[in-house]
Amino acid sequence: MKKIITILLFILISNSIWASFIYVPMSYDNQKNHLKAYGIVYFGLEAGLKSKWLLNYDGGAFLIENNKAIENECKIRGVSYQIISDAKAQLILQEI
């Protein structure tokens, strides 16, 4: 039983290890500076990262390959973002 609890805690704590995408919402409610958000996507593309534009989802949100530099730029520029798992990204893509 102790082993199972340890494994479950490890999975919950290390969720960011398996996260493979940075989700940048573009809806009015979730993003305060849209121009800076587009700049983040451009920054990622210039760095050679793959991005997906989710035209009909959350105001035209973006999925960018998870990268620490992109995450840091989002923090510096004040861009709203979420780290999501590959499974959640696939669910979003299927919904579109």
Regions found by a protein language model. Name each.
Residues 4-16:
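Sec-dependent N-terminal signal peptides
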Residues 20-96:
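Intrinsic-disorder/low-complexity accessory segments
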